């Protein structure tokens, strides 16, 4: 709320699809729940996935009913789980945007290099540029500009966003999450 008070009237900030958990669909969650319901399976996931709803339940509800859901803080923890429970299938819920793809790939390689046969990955990575295109194609409301995520942009660069101005005539600016960076990005967008 603090930044909004600093902005002149006529400028409205709208949060976009920045959280992979928030844009994880029910189909993916239903697949995860189907695995969670198996007695021979341990679901390894980040804690924020526990309350994401599927069409009929959530991981936290499945856990309350006896499913083994293990909250991890880094994907590499699946290796420890695999060794601790060799008789179980470890299914890691691999979600995220461009920023998490590298660490997931490193985990896949580490699992392969360790010869572990009981680790599986249920993957649902999202890409920011197609999400932005989908927002513009839907035209739900009017979008005058995009503040682009700095952490994703460090990985993909600025070129994948070129379509915003070329195809849609929508200005954009890459920024971090700090208040001053966001204000600078807004000023940059207004000048374009």
Regions found by a protein language model. Name each.
Residues 93, 97-160:
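Phosphate/pyrophosphate-binding betaalpha-module
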Residues 32-41, 89-95, 138-151, 166-168, ...:
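A polyampholytic, Gly/Pro-enriched intrinsically disordered region
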Residues 45, 70, 91-94, 120-122, ...:
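Short catalytic-loop micro-motif centered on adjacent basic/acidic residues
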Residues 1-87, 101, 111-114, 122, ...:
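Metallocofactor- and cofactor-centric catalytic cores in central/energy metabolism, strongly enriched
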């Amino acid at each position: 709320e603090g930044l909004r008070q600093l902005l002149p009237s006529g400028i409205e900030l709208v949060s976009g699809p920045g959280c992979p958990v928030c844009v994880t669909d029910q189909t993916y969650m239903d697949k995860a729940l189907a695995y969670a319901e198996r007695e021979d399976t341990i679901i390894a996931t980040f804690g924020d996935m526990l309350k994401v709803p599927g069409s009929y339940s959530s991981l936290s509800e499945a856990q309350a009913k006896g499913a083994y859901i293990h909250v991890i803080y880094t994907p590499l923890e699946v290796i420890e789980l695999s060794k601790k429970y060799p008789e179980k299938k470890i299914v890691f819920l691999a979600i995220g945007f461009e920023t998490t793809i590298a660490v997931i790939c490193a985990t896949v390689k580490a699992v392969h290099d360790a010869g572990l046969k009981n680790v599986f990955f249920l993957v649902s990575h999202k890409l920011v540029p197609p999400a932005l295109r989908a927002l513009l194609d839907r035209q739900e409301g009017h979008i005058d500009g995009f503040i682009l995520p700095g952490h994703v942009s460090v990985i993909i660069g600025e070129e994948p966003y070129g379509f915003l101005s070329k195809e849609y005539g929508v200005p954009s600016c890459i920024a971090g999450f700090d208040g001053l960076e966001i204000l600078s990005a807004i000023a940059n967008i207004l000048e374009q």
